[in-house]
Amino acid sequence: MAVDGTLVYIRVTLLLLWLGVFLSISGYCQAGPSQHFTSPEVVIPLKVISRGRSAKAPGWLSYSLRFGGQKHVVHMRVKKLLVSRHLPVFTYTDDRALLEDQLFIPDDCYYHGYVEAAPESLVVFSACFGGFRGVLKISGLTYEIEPIRHSATFEHLVYKINSNETQFPAMRCGLTEKEVARQQLEFEEAENSALEPKSAGDWWTHAWFLELVVVVNHDFFIYSQSNISKVQEDVFLVVNIVDSMYKQLGTYIILIGIEIWNQGNVFPMTSIEQVLNDFSQWKQISLSQLQHDAAHMFIKNSLISILGLAYVAGICRPPIDCGVDNFQGDTWSLFANTVAHELGHTLGMQHDEEFCFCGERGCIMNTFRVPAEKFTNCSYADFMKTTLNQGSCLHNPPRLGEIFMLKRCGNGVVEREEQCDCGSVQQCEQDACCLLNCTLRPGAACAFGLCCKDCKFMPSGELCRQEVNECDLPEWCNGTSHQCPEDRYVQDGIPCSDSAYCYQKRCNNHDQHCREIFGKDAKSASQNCYKEINSQGNRFGHCGINGTTYLKCHISDVFCGRVQCENVRDIPLLQDHFTLQHTHINGVTCWGIDYHLRMNISDIGEVKDGTVCGPGKICIHKKCVSLSVLSHVCLPETCNMKGICNNKHHCHCGYGWSPPYCQHRGYGGSIDSGPASAKRGVFLPLIVIPSLSVLTFLFTVGLLMYLRQCSGPKETKAHSSG
């Protein structure tokens, strides 16, 4: 059971891969009377503090809500991939000039989860605008919750959504058979020649990422009280619900931009077919500044009886990667069903037929308008067929902070000729160094940087970047710049602790790697574990991934595949999607961790480059290679044995010697580090070079022997005299 509400990606076998992609237009059929609420109940969510065995993993929140005659405990956690961190919102001036603003969207106020003791429940909340707003689905019933504005006691209203099927009569699709045939004939030839079907072995991936742009027409804007902030809040709510519906397909729906037609519609709204056609042409030019996978238009038009329309399998194929969703003014959860349905068409899904099933009375791609939250086996098959053939734009997770960033004064990023950029008006009012026009205030020398303090350059020799480990090196300010020198570290291949070698600022070894995953008592497993597991070529043991194939490790490279551990005392608490494996080999229990295709998170189980794999050998790119492959232009002799080579092959001198070659007296550092401070005192090298270690050891042993010799005769004599 998904105890903590973790959404399980249902894997449905794709029975048939069709050649070509059928493209047509599919209308979400005509609506009947609008949905109605029951009378709302007033509830006050109370935070639940879990302790002991009932405590949730970090990141989970729990609230108790009493409605419908009983108490419900909601468990939820933050969604991280939903809205771009700097969301571009486009509106229009009175003279129809386009304005762009970038909202800073908090990444900790969109939640999803479940209701305790309610199997198949769903919770989708936002808390960005004061209180909880969203949807709860419990035992086949749907509820919407919203905060009571300005309530001093955190009061909310909970509405039960009527789900009587008589309110949802059969709906007619907007296409005739003749139109379907025409669309198929028009697009089939070009599509078949353009597509290159992918391997059937790649039909399941861990995650897809659909970057969505939403355009809101003027009637929708009027319905949202002609308030741009209210429009944004409504759009966020709908996308949040839709995203939760698509989790079962392993798909993230990520909002990357909104355009609001606040001054009137850009083109007429006469029929749903005309709106879709005009929208697909308009967006090709007007949304070109936003790289997106799909664009959907939210309209509100009671004169258009069709709820939605989209090009089937238009994903990744501009300009037909779009759809239109018609809000009927009923409930946001039902409108989210419409959006999920039309987005399903964009992703290649057809309407469900008699042999399609999802385990519920109503399914998302049903031709009947009923509350639904699941896709059928037919929808899975259509989705996988489309994404296999043309879903390349869905493969890569977006960098949410970099989706859209106009270069301009006021975006908080120093660009071009700007001296500084303090961001918004409110931020600039609190900035002592930077003005609103991106110039420095009078008397200020700087406004940011590791070597800027109180609008002044920090003095020469001031430490600005402390070394973080034995393979790192410090940097100091030069007194004339706000920037700390570029981060430098010890040259690759220089020995570090535990008979390891520094590599790219790290001192890696298998034992330490095992301790990081399994705790302080764990250690690297025997050679038999590495040979047996890493030669299998599966997600628990391999030497890399080529496309969709796990590569078996050659016998000489088994220590460079996946780390294998033993002496494991505790099972670690890991991120979602990781799986632990323990295998008994020759009386030893070998522990490892998996990594499968397109997890899109850091692989903590792969052996890190630079890890020792044999005498004088290290792992690089899953191969066990000789240390000689590393370029050692700089040697200890280069630094006169008084310093260490850095990653630029320059000498970083010990205290008492000056760069570049540590020949003359000075305060240490390198030509890259900035001038070292004269106040550091005695220099203690970060790297224990073996020769120095031996000298230290011999000195210590000699000293002990000397002391023992000095004290020995006295003890012997005293013992003899007794």
UniProtKB/Swiss-Prot annotation:
Residues 406-492 form the Disintegrin domain. Its cofactor is Zn(2+). Residues 208-398 form the Peptidase M12B domain. It holds the Pfam family ADAM_CR. One of its GO terms (cellular component) is axon. Has no obvious cleavage site for furin endopeptidase, suggesting that the proteolytic processing is regulated. A tripeptide motif (VGE) within disintegrin-like domain could be involved in the binding to egg integrin receptor and thus could mediate sperm/egg binding. The cysteine-rich domain encodes putative cell-fusion peptides, which could be involved in sperm-egg fusion. This is Disintegrin and metalloproteinase domain-containing protein 21. It comes from Homo sapiens. The lineage of its organism: Eukaryota, Metazoa, Chordata, Craniata, Vertebrata.
